[in-house]
Amino acid sequence: MKFTSNTLLFALSVAPVAAFTNPSPWSASSATTTALNAERSSNNVFSTFCATAAMSALLWGSPGMLAEPANNHQLPFGLNEIVQQNVVASAKDKASATGSRVNKDAESLLRLGLPIESKEVRELQSSLEGIKQDVASKRKGPAADGAKKVKSILASKKADKMAAVCRDAKVCTATMKEINDLMDPLEKAIKASQDAFTGSLEERDALDKAYNAQVKAAKLLTTLEEQMVPKGYKTPVPSQYSDLPQLEQRATVEMLIKKGEAGAQFDINGVNFPEARMTMVIDGYTSPVTGGNFVDLVNKGFYDNMPIQRSDGFVVQTGDPDGEAVGYTGGKAGKAIGEGPKGERLIPCEISIVGDKMPIYETTIEDEGRGGEATILPFSAYGAMGWARDEYDPNSGSSQFFWLLFDSDLTPAGKNVLDGRYPCFGYVVEGADFLQDVKEGDVIVSAKVTEGLQYLKQPN
């Protein structure tokens, strides 16, 4: 069975790159170097062209690359299909990009995916998140201006408007005060970095402090925005899927992976780790059925002791159990979709589009004639989680999923062509760097739901 996208562009867009998830942008990590180089070279058309041409030559020049895999794993794209077409999706509302900059911050994307309508908090989010980008690129003046803008917003009537739409105004008021208080040490750290010699330890230390203050403030921003989700809010789901598990809000899953070879360790930018620990946020607002299915399987222990079945530099994939079945067979199949050829519990393809009140089901954006529209959660962050399915059947997904290894340098802003074809149901928010060395044969020791299990709704 194959699982494909339909464009050469996507194949050219997803080379392995470390996520920008380190506690400090100045640690000796190639992940940081990658992020900074991406920023500095974002307008280097020639380098992008060369990289694209090199990948094209690889695909066209290696017939073996086009062979179908000799296994049952559902794949997120087939190279034989990719080289036949060159279809580019031109996003109208770029959820995955602003201007020419691709938003590859998983936590930012999750905030943008919340069902809230406060223009004031989105303005606050834009200013606060901009500080992180400016600090990482040593744009010290703009970073300082961003901190002043955050304080200005929080000192204005906009703060009252934000508190007014919270479920608990007191919680939001206190949270906004904490964010505001963090701007003082952030500004002080930026000023210290401006006074230090470029490249000095003093500059690095000051930028570390500024970066860490922004990270703390951003986590508080998440708390603030989550308070703005209306009480009891649930994404509408058609009644025909009521016999499938559903996730009504968000859940957090922690996963522990070890090397398949005894004694082997994960090599992350020259540092060895005996195990890989990742934290993922699963989104039930945009993917109630897909997210519910995944959280249900995690809670059942389905992924415990399961090997990684694919790692090719584009994706890391798992979820295919032993035996003839290519998905989960332990539960009752839903009536609307039915079961797979080997008794697999199947779920419908589920896509949430910007501006819609509920997801579309059993189809894709292209099949709906809405090609180019933006999805709420895009495949634009390293470690974005996608639901695998058969190439030509949108409703053949069961238990296989993948983490996307995303490289924004080769993906034009707003043109990630997985969006709208496959559900993006969550992101890795901690430990995404480990994905660069998770290989086929490595083993998921355990996967556990650590938060949000109460939001998993089982069929009656």
Where do the protein language model's features map onto the residues?
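N-terminal chloroplast transit peptides
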Residues: 1-39
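Acidic/proline-rich low-complexity IDRs
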Residues: 7-11, 35, 57-58, 65, ...
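Cyclophilin-like peptidyl-prolyl cis-trans isomerases
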Residues: 68-460
